[in-house]
């Protein structure tokens, strides 16, 4: 069972990520949205994960790798490619894309 959920806003000019924790059937937000490229969303997420002793290093690495993959995917696409939401959800099934423009 997945313990954490990454949520993404997939926008034309930026991508944003937040982290939620799953507890049973409930989901509780742990972070605000960190926007990239306005700030270093990856670094902000890393700082958050490192500050929580109850999140182990293997979970942190997995989450940060997923953030890296999605930010890289966003960077590699032009504006028209960023609109292909179905491809995105297929490529990254373990994260939630909750907003698009």
Curated annotation (Swiss-Prot):
It comes from the Eukaryota. The lineage of its organism: Eukaryota, Discoba, Euglenozoa, Euglenida, Spirocuta. One of its GO terms (biological process) is translation. One of its GO terms (cellular component) is ribosome. GO terms for molecular function: structural constituent of ribosome. This is Small ribosomal subunit protein cS23. It is found in: Plastid, Chloroplast. Probably a ribosomal protein or a ribosome-associated protein. Keywords: Chloroplast, Plastid, Ribonucleoprotein, Ribosomal protein. InterPro entries: PSRP-3/Ycf65_sf (IPR038447), Ribosomal_PSRP3/Ycf65 (IPR006924). Part of the 30S ribosomal subunit. Belongs to the chloroplast-specific ribosomal protein cS23 family. The gene is ycf65. Its main location: plastid. Gene3D superfamilies: 3.30.390.140.
